[in-house]
């Protein structure tokens, strides 16, 4: 349910873009994000940090897009968000006792420290690559292609990378955890 709520504003953005334009879609994205955030808070009494950061980025970059009537801001939001995620992962890798991925999943999974480090670095690189891909698609290709890439391309890449990470985790899980 939470994943659907996180994905819903993106669907709203896509639909409003196809029906109207990037500016109406950006406004709809802001509203949908705020509604999803409010619903999440009232239903679960908790909002994940990544969800909150994403919502703040949508509010800031969406508002700038509307205020300056420039699609540059909403296009940059994707890259800035991915770079922030990558930086958070890298900072946790280099300056904290546990990588961020381990702090997020470590209660459910028992894995060797090297596996946590590899996962953490892999996701950091993934986010950096996605941020760079977004720059290329957003600024060198037509807006329609960028919207499709943002909604379908990045979502598909994230899903595939999540599955690859799941396989990697499974291969390194203790046997007793694999059975449960």
Swiss-Prot record:
Cellular component GO terms, alphabetical: plasma membrane
Membrane-topology descriptor: Multi-pass membrane protein
Encoding gene per record: yciB
Protein name (record): Inner membrane-spanning protein YciB
Pfam families the UniProt entry points to: IspA
Keywords: Cell inner membrane, Cell membrane, Membrane, Transmembrane, Transmembrane helix
Major subcellular location class: membrane
Keyword Cell inner membrane: yes
PANTHER family for the chain: INNER MEMBRANE-SPANNING PROTEIN YCIB, INTRACELLULAR SEPTATION PROTEIN A-RELATED
Function of the protein: Plays a role in cell envelope biogenesis, maintenance of cell envelope integrity and membrane homeostasis.
Family assignment from sequence similarity: Belongs to the YciB family.
TM stretches of this protein: 22-42, 50-70, 72-92, 121-141, 149-169
Cellular location(s): Cell inner membrane
Organism domain of life: Bacteria
Record InterPro entries: YciB (IPR006008)
């Amino acid at each position: 349910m939470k994943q659907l709520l996180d994905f819903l504003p993106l669907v709203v953005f896509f639909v409003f873009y196809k029906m109207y334009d990037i500016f109406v879609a950006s406004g709809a994205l802001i509203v949908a994000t705020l509604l999803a955030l409010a619903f999440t808070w009232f239903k679960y009494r908790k909002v994940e940090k990544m969800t909150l950061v994403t919502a703040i980025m949508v509010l800031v970059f969406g508002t700038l897009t509307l205020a300056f009537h420039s699609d540059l801001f909403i296009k940059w939001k994707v890259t800035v968000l991915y770079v922030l995620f990558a930086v958070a992962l890298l900072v946790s890798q280099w300056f904290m006792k546990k990588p961020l991925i381990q702090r997020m999943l470590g209660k459910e999974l028992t894995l060797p420290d090297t596996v946590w480090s590899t996962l953490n670095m892999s996701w950091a690189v993934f986010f950096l690559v996605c941020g760079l891909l977004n720059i290329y698609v957003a600024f060198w290709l037509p807006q329609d292609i960028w919207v499709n890439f943002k909604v379908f391309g990045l979502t598909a890449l994230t899903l595939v990378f999540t599955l690859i990470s799941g396989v990697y985790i499974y291969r390194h899980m203790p046997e007793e955890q694999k059975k449960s």
